[in-house]
């Protein structure tokens, strides 16, 4: 029993295929979705999207957006999305270190907010990689 998942960014279609289950990071916590889920629209936080295919899970880093669930279709509109398999681990770790350093030297409210967002994005990318490695091991 499957349903269609479509993940879109402003520039591309990241995913458009049948899945068995997903777990989303919403602004109010995580939500699991199976076939015949009740209709819902929700805001998405910067976080991990877990996608269950037949017998394996895939992980994707989402950079915030919205999801619409209904009629066995889920449409996810996000600022950006990356499959964990497409993320370079060394580059992601380096980006995380830079984001942490930028937060430490941020001055003023605006710089602090921007640095916090960059740090959350960087942590999400690293988390996606770590979760994928754990599933493989």
Swiss-Prot record:
Membrane topology classification: Peripheral membrane protein
Keyword entries, A-Z: ATP synthesis, CF(1), Chloroplast, Hydrogen ion transport, Ion transport, Membrane, Plastid, Thylakoid, Transport
Residue intervals passing through the bilayer: none
GO molecular function: ATP binding; proton-transporting ATP synthase activity, rotational mechanism
CDD domains named among the record's database cross-references: F1-ATPase_delta
Keyword Oxidoreductase listed: no
Similarity annotation: Belongs to the ATPase epsilon chain family.
Description of how the protein assembles with itself and partners: F-type ATPases have 2 components, CF(1) - the catalytic core - and CF(0) - the membrane proton channel. CF(1) has five subunits: alpha(3), beta(3), gamma(1), delta(1), epsilon(1). CF(0) has three main subunits: a, b and c.
Identification of the protein by name: ATP synthase epsilon chain, chloroplastic
Organism this protein belongs to: Pisum sativum
Upper classification of the organism: Eukaryota, Viridiplantae, Streptophyta, Embryophyta, Tracheophyta
